[in-house]
């Protein structure tokens, strides 16, 4: 077996058979933020109730913005006359 060292010198990749691969240390993940206490919503809170005075913002652009307690609606028209409405439910 004295020829083994000569064999490893001639074929250095043979060292990989007996050498464990280098493993980098595991990454340390930052701890998760603490969960804040929250209260449970009532069933009546899920209804889309309009505000006592609906909010409509006049703008210089041809945009209409309306909001309720749980949604925001933006409406505009293109130059071609197509009406575009985007509604975001909160």
Swiss-Prot record:
<protein>
    <recommendedName>
        <fullName>Protein E4</fullName>
    </recommendedName>
</protein>
<dbReference type="InterPro" id="IPR003861">
    <property type="entry name" value="Papilloma_E4"/>
</dbReference>
<keyword id="KW-0597">Phosphoprotein</keyword>
<comment type="function">
    <text>Contributes to multiple aspects of the viral life cycle including viral genome amplification, suppression of suprabasal cell differentiation and egress of newly formed virions. Induces host cell cycle arrest at the G2 phase by associating with and preventing the nuclear entry of host CDK1/cyclin B1 complexes. Inhibits cellular DNA replication by preventing loading of host replication licensing proteins MCM2 and MCM7 onto chromatin. Within the cytoplasm, associates with host kinase SRPK1, a splicing factor regulator, and inhibits its activity.</text>
</comment>
<keyword id="KW-0945">Host-virus interaction</keyword>
<comment type="subunit">
    <text>Assembles into oligomeric complexes. Interacts with host CDK1. Interacts with host SRPK1; this interaction may favor expression of late viral transcripts. Interacts with host cytokeratin components KRT8 and KRT18.</text>
</comment>
<keyword id="KW-1035">Host cytoplasm</keyword>
<dbReference type="GO" id="GO:0039592">
    <property type="term" value="P:symbiont-mediated arrest of host cell cycle during G2/M transition"/>
</dbReference>
<keyword id="KW-1048">Host nucleus</keyword>
<dbReference type="Pfam" id="PF02711">
    <property type="entry name" value="Pap_E4"/>
</dbReference>
<comment type="similarity">
    <text>Belongs to the papillomaviridae E4 protein family.</text>
</comment>
<dbReference type="GO" id="GO:0042025">
    <property type="term" value="C:host cell nucleus"/>
</dbReference>
<keyword id="KW-1079">Host G2/M cell cycle arrest by virus</keyword>
<keyword id="KW-1121">Modulation of host cell cycle by virus</keyword>
<dbReference type="GO" id="GO:0030430">
    <property type="term" value="C:host cell cytoplasm"/>
</dbReference>
<keyword id="KW-0244">Early protein</keyword>
